[in-house]
Amino acid sequence: PSFCPKPGDGTGLYEAMLEAKAQGKIRHIGITNHRLNVAMEALESGLYETLQFPFNYLATEKEHKLVEVCREKNIGFIAMKALSGGLITNSKVAYAYQAQYDNVLPIWGVQRETELDEFISYIDNPPVLDEEIKAVIENDKKELAGNFCRGCGYCMPTCPAHIEINNCARMSLLLRRS
């Protein structure tokens, strides 16, 4: 949501989560968001046990702060867009980067069986965040970091022509990476 659901805010969302937990339908209350300010508000509220937020090696310093706050507050961090919606094409590098955080669980967004096989192979033979991998990360940051479309789709409902704005905005980057 575009806000942080809280008890008594009039939406009933947080109360519904509490009810679902009391009924045993869920074990934890978490929040998923793409907005940094909403994510930080959720962490500071003390109401949530997990945060699901876009996080990969293209993340900004402010996004890294979310990981630190989650660690400090013992809140689970689920990293969505761990491959940045297809912009990050080297799974070995992405895996090594995410593995440095003991409190981050990435969602890889596997689309092909071969990709799944790659990630499964890292369980027994995990890549290490060495100088070679760090160099790849730095190169990708120079090429890709900044104010690029992260593919969340929040802009889509606003287009009266129903243009897939997120895909159009990312096309030049995706073509360059292919």
What label would you give each PLM region?
Residues 65-79, 83-178:
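Structured C-terminal cap/extension of enzyme domains
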Residues 1-78, 83-86:
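Glycine/proline-rich, positively charged
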